[in-house]
Amino acid sequence: MSNVDYIVSTEESDILIENDSKRITDDIVDQLIVYRKQLKLTQQDIADATGIKRANIARLELKKNEASLDSLVRYAKSMKLELAIELVKR
């Protein structure tokens, strides 16, 4: 997806911004899954380490609902990773 102009405040741009947010979250989830599998960890291992129910880890990985920032951070920390969010001037 191309860059979204966040200054334009129309119904259409809100949809584009939401889609961009979903894409970013999905990309992070994909990376977390890759790391989990490289470490040979199960969803249950992640659940035990984070306190998030295994069923919710599965939903997060299946992208059933948009993951909260807190869940992504806890998931990353369970594998000794840090989730970094960076603001970049356009």
Where do the PLM segments sit?
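N-terminal flexible/basic segments that precede or flank functional cores
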Residues: 1-30
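Recognition helix of helix-turn-helix/homeodomain-like DNA-binding domains
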Residues: 50-66
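Flexible coil/turn residues that form the inter-helical turn or adjacent wing/linker of helix-turn-helix
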Residues: 28, 39, 65-68
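DNA major-groove recognition helix of helix-turn-helix/homeodomain DNA-binding modules
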Residues: 70-85
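Short basic helix-loop element that most often maps to the first helix and adjoining turn
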Residues: 2, 30-47, 74
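Short, charged recognition helix plus adjacent turn
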Residues: 86-90
